[in-house]
Amino acid sequence: MSQNSELRQSFIRFAVEAGVLSFGEFVTKAGRTSPYFFNAGKFADGALLGQVAQFYAKTLLDSGVEFDMLFGPAYKGITLASATAVALAGLGRNVGFAYNRKEAKDHGEGGSLVGAKLQGRVVIVDDVISAGTSVRESVELIRAAGATPAAVLILMDRMERSGNAVDIGERSAVQDVQAQYGMPVVSIANLDDLLGYLDNAGDPALAGYREKAAAYRDKYGVSAI
């Protein structure tokens, strides 16, 4: 197993142990019944956030993406980007980070942007990509500041076609972002990594979900990027 594969599998195990990745029967916003659910909101204490940031930082450095700073879209991305900046500094790569407010301030420092000045090549840090709205808004803010969106860094790529339970699109939200903005989307792990985890988990309680996850992948999944 390569170092990258080990990192991906370590993240899946970590997410399961933290209760962030759970198995069962869940209805997604698209109306599809999924055998797994990923809830990044459960990374809710200092120790968990610190570990997540390490996964983000190592994945970004391993990706080969050239970057100068990080951007965290409000609201989840704010914490994720700032924690990742701390982790990067600990690994010897000190970069600035910025984030946006949902509503611009008209007092104090004012404006909708907080943190380091947006400049150079900027990596957008978020949890997942669903409809791509957060990415679009981030790209617009970064370009308006005269900087260049370099990549999007996310926790989990569901590798799932857009649409709903009946109308199934040709591409995933991640593929749409890559095609529209011409920049890579780097994920710590994806659905194939989840299937690999279930293959090797050795837990009878999880064995039944391997077949369900594979069937879900066959019905709604896209090819690996």
Curated annotation (Swiss-Prot):
Its EC number is 2.4.2.10. Homodimer. It is an enzyme of class 2 (transferase). Coiled coil: none annotated. NCBIfam families: pyrE. Belongs to the purine/pyrimidine phosphoribosyltransferase family. PyrE subfamily. Catalyzes the transfer of a ribosyl phosphate group from 5-phosphoribose 1-diphosphate to orotate, leading to the formation of orotidine monophosphate (OMP). It comes from Ralstonia pickettii (strain 12J). 5-phospho-alpha-D-ribose 1-diphosphate binds at residues 29, 75-76, 101-102, 105, 107, 126-134. GO terms for biological process: 'de novo' pyrimidine nucleobase biosynthetic process; 'de novo' UMP biosynthetic process; pyrimidine ribonucleoside biosynthetic process. Pathway: Pyrimidine metabolism; UMP biosynthesis via de novo pathway; UMP from orotate: step 1/2. One of its GO terms (cellular component) is cytoplasm. GO terms for molecular function: magnesium ion binding; orotate phosphoribosyltransferase activity. Gene3D superfamilies: 3.40.50.2020. This is Orotate phosphoribosyltransferase. It catalyses: orotidine 5'-phosphate + diphosphate = orotate + 5-phospho-alpha-D-ribose 1-diphosphate.
